[in-house]
Amino acid sequence: VTVTIANGTAIGGSAFGATKHINTQVGGATHGFFQVDNMSALGAYTLPMGNGTLYLPITLTPATLSSFSVGVFTGITEDGLPNGTAFTAGKKAGVVDAVWTINRNSGTSCDMTLDWPASLEGATFATYTNAQIGISHWDNPNWGTSVGTGDNTLNTATRSGVSVFSPFGVGKTPYVLPIKFNYLNAAKGNGY
């Protein structure tokens, strides 16, 4: 099921939230989508998405005139699909328990911001600093590295310059890569 806004008009109204949003979560393998065509370049479009009880908006800022179809469901899965194998409790502890599917119909790249309620944060995720939060893309056959910036108070994550689309999730950004030293020379100096 897809609902389409053909003229790129921003969604009007106010007070979007848990009780007022576009519900794209459906049962089984079916996935609901909300499509917005003719989105102007560099205009931020907030799409008031959710699952019927939780508000999970998506903000897209396209680089060029674009069209996107978006949907969201709760219950993150191994393959980013609504009927996929659920993450184990251990894996869910470090992520937001939701999947945002963003498909580009036309255009090039965009910046994206994903929002979520604290109730979807895993126990470990809730302890992450802002610098440790990013957006991960389903890279088939696995979830890719989480990159971008986050805010664990406002419960948002942003990823810039996205040009490959499909399912996205929110998790921990990678650690600094370890360095292997082949040679290290140190000396005592300055009285220390």
Q: In which residue ranges do the predicted regions lie?
A:
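Solvent-exposed, conformationally flexible loop/turn segments
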Residues: L154-T156, G189-Y192
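Residue-level detector of functionally pivotal "anchor" positions at catalytic/ligand-binding pockets or at interdomain
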Residues: G169-N190
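Self-processing/autoproteolytic domain segments and adjacent N-terminal interaction modules in large
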Residues: V1-S146, S163-Y175
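Short, surface-exposed terminal/edge motifs of secreted or surface/virion proteins that either
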Residues: P141-A157
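Small-side-chain structural scaffolding
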Residues: S136, G148-G150, A186
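Short, flexible loop/turn segments at beta-strand junctions in immunoglobulin-like
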Residues: R159-G161
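Functionally constrained cores in energy, signaling, and assembly domains
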Residues: G134-S136, L154-N155, Y183
